Amino acid sequence: MRTCLIALFLLLSLVAAPTVRASVPWERLPGVNLTEADNGLRGKAIEIMKAENCYYECPDTVYSCVTKAAPAMTALRMAGVIVRLLVDGKTPDDISAELRNRAKSAHPFKKAKIDTSGMPRVGPEGSSVTVVIYADFDCPYCRVVSPRLIKLQHSLGDQVSIVFKLFPVKAHGPQSVVTSKAGWAAQLQGCFWAFHDVMYANFDDHDDDNIVRLANKAGCDLGPFKTAWNAKDTKEKLRTLKREGVKLGVKSTPSIFVNGKRYHGLKTAAELRDRLEEELDLVGR
């Protein structure tokens, strides 16, 4: 009788077994280059997966969630973050902090309401995901992140749009207000994105004469551009944009919102892309 019960228990265990995988499905982790993840790194990744809880879809550790027969997409993304950051040399504490930031970015307590009408935009209005970046033409990191977001929009297509909000920061120098006013003048002339590109490509040449030269290079009509650049309405528009950003908690640039959700994570191309794809999953693409 005892032998029969043991046999029955083993049979039931086998029937239940398909709910768990034998190992992490490394090939399914988004944004992971498996050639960079040797066995030693994978072992470290598994340790972190066992220590971190999945923040959505699966109420268990990341490891338990990714080793199920049908792993939760959130867990797969979290595992991908872990591997990518280990490859980049981050510590377990760094990775834990980034995962917390990712959770806050994807599932905040409250979303911001941001008016994007009339703002510079790449991609269609009404896209599934709208990314708003508060940036400054004299901000060194904006020079990297804004073109990076535009490149991601080109890759992801019309599901995503990028909206640029001018937010001059005095710490970037007195010219930051001047270049932001020039940016709004370019927007009024319909040449903002070409101006955006030449301004960041010529980051160290933002005196007034060079701004005019770059506006001309961007195809702006210089007469109306100069008029708008120095107009009282342009100065007031910059004040309005600044007040709006401050009200949303923006203190530095670049600051990013994804469908009204403040982005707290790393601004590498891989992490930004993964966050945008996660948001597409959340809205059902």
Language-model features and meaning:
Residues 158-177, 232-235:
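Thiol-based oxidoreductase modules, predominantly thioredoxin-like and allied folds used
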Residues 39-55:
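Immediate flanking context of iron-sulfur cluster ligation sites
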Residues 73-74, 132-135, 141-153, 165, ...:
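C-terminal cap of thioredoxin/glutaredoxin-like
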Residues 1-4:
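Positively charged n-region of N-terminal signal peptides that target proteins for export
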Residues 51-67, 137-141:
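Local cysteine-cluster metal-coordination motifs and their immediate loop/turn environment
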Residues 6-15:
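Bacterial N-terminal signal peptides
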Residues 39-43, 114-129, 154:
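A short beta-strand-turn-helix
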Residues 23-30, 104-122:
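N-terminal "domain-start" segment that seeds a small globular fold
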